[in-house]
């Protein structure tokens, strides 16, 4: 016994151990290389704990691949829906919208990829190194996006990789009465996907020469007892993306034509699939018989509407020993949508202690799958616009040029976008502007200029322009797509600045989490805004003054008002302006403008004449007040201002310049204030 132990443990130097050799003792011990050969180690069976760890790693990798398959399936499904909704022939009519092309119709361009004729609304001009412009239809543009987002451009040349099947775990179980078949009791950590079965050609390549199809009944219950190796999802994605995303099956509960392409519609489809119950486990027959290639009735899925209709997806045979025979209904969606071809083949069955299939994953796992899909959060689109501040006329011009790649909001994979502008702080209907709505497009071209009047240099220093892109819905609420914001103090006067910015989700305006001096400045700025809040809510008025020597009197022009306060319940006002030259000159001292219905930015362009000597004008003051007209009750006061010698600031300067420069019209913007006033009647 002692000799056996001594022979088994030898010193690394292959020499006998000497007790007085300290250097050899410091070198340590090692296992004799002849004690356990590689062949003996390979024949040893793995323990149940090791198999559990391996199965968990495989299941976790499969879960990530399944989520990736679903994400790519949604992208390709949206592309196929766009292909099904074509309305023209691509020759005389636009392939997308069906609009007439030619001399009597719209101008047409030829798609670079599909060589079909499209109108300029449905075509997108792409940048290229070629001297002539390159146009793509929206279908081909979407197909290129699918290639980029699915990784097909990368996996096209990616080498094949194989993940092993989970290993059966042997547990000591009580003996069952004779005649009762052994049931599958041990669940796997994660459900398996039948779409991972390899194609028939791959199986024949991996099968040794001379081996016939059928289960291997002589294999020992260990490493060789599990099923054949399967293909990775990346390999299948590569093969399908190389065929221009064709042959994908639309087995999302019957058809995808009625399913919305919005994220909410996708999540509803996922939850419906996850709610389906899993079929009960089927007892394993003994001994197992070879599986026939013919699929059972009702297992063949309908081929997708791609350009290769002959490519169909078959469900795996319903043999109890087949690894993917019992699977949740949710996997029916994952397999075909991922574009796999599960060709019928024979496989070595599991042993009688093979693990059973788990029920569908819980809602938390479904939410994880949705959160893993990051495309919906990053494809809001880009907006191209330009800004110009005309300092002389106190005018801010915002030209909305175009948007590209907007997020699809309608069931047809398109949107009805429009752009609206707000000035912050104090966003309201009074400072909201919007463009027209363009129908059924994700790449709208507006080329529309929106103007803000009465924007002073002070406004440019403390205001922010919010530009939002929304989708118009005739039968419901308009949906928000994305927005961007620009601080006007960064804009130089009389210099146009162009922007091409990616849209973002709603940006919070609260200054949360600021500390120290930054927090102090934030509170100071908010306090300043609150102090002038009453002034801003009243609005502004553009007034022109000119003393005419020919007519011998003062000509007052009321041009427009902007950003007036809303006085009616509908969020608007019915404004008019009243003039009163003080001290009282009788009835000829009072004038009124016309009433503008339901607006907060009225444009009057009216002039009024006061017959007065130039020497007497210095003793007078002009009271200007803006009112909201109401029927059956007293009018509401919005705001006013007073020009004259007793005024201050810009009002005094305006009055003084009028007296100094005869026969010269001088225009100034004035802030409306909640001053003391008399009745408008």
UniProtKB/Swiss-Prot annotation:
Gene3D superfamilies: C2 domain (2.60.40.150), Zinc/RING finger domain, C3HC4 (zinc finger) (3.30.40.10)
Ranges for domain RabBD: 40-157
Residues the entry annotates as binding Ca(2+) 4: 568, 628, 630, 636
Keyword Repeat: yes
Residues where Zn(2+) 1 binds: 94, 97, 119, 122
Disruption of the gene: reported phenotype: No visible phenotype. Mice are viable and fertile and do not display any physiological impairment. Additionally, synaptic properties seem unaffected.
Protein biosynthesis as UniProt keyword: no
Biased segments, Pro residues type: 278-296
InterPro entries reported in the protein's UniProt record: C2_dom (IPR000008), C2_domain_sf (IPR035892), FYVE_2 (IPR041282), FYVE_RPH3A (IPR028698), Rab_BD (IPR010911), Rabphilin/DOC2/Noc2 (IPR043566), Rabphilin_Doc2_C2A (IPR047022), Synaptotagmin (IPR001565)
Main subcellular location: membrane
Annotated residues for binding of Ca(2+) 1: 409-410, 471, 473, 479
Binding site for Ca(2+) 2: 410, 416, 471-473
Tissue localization of expression: Specifically expressed in brain.
GO BP annotations listed: intracellular protein transport; spontaneous neurotransmitter secretion; synaptic vesicle priming
SUPFAM superfamilies: C2 domain (Calcium/lipid-binding domain, CaLB), FYVE/PHD zinc finger
Entry function: Plays an essential role in docking and fusion steps of regulated exocytosis. At the presynaptic level, RPH3A is recruited by RAB3A to the synaptic vesicle membrane in a GTP-dependent manner where it modulates synaptic vesicle trafficking and calcium-triggered neurotransmitter release. In the post-synaptic compartment, forms a ternary complex with GRIN2A and DLG4 and regulates NMDA receptor stability. Also plays a role in the exocytosis of arginine vasopressin hormone.
Subunit and partners: Interacts with RAB3B, RAB3C, RAB3D, RAB8A, RAB27A and RAB27B. Interacts with RAB3A; this interaction recruits RPH3A to synaptic vesicules. Interacts (via C2B domain) with SNAP25. Interacts with deubiquitinating enzyme CAND1; this interaction results in the deubiquitination of RPH3A. Interacts with GRIN2A and DLG4; this ternary complex regulates NMDA receptor composition at postsynaptic membranes. Interacts with SNCA.
Domain observations: Binds calcium via the C2 domains. The calcium-bound C2 domains mediate interactions with phospholipid bilayers.
Name under which the protein is recorded: Rabphilin-3A
GN (gene name): Rph3a
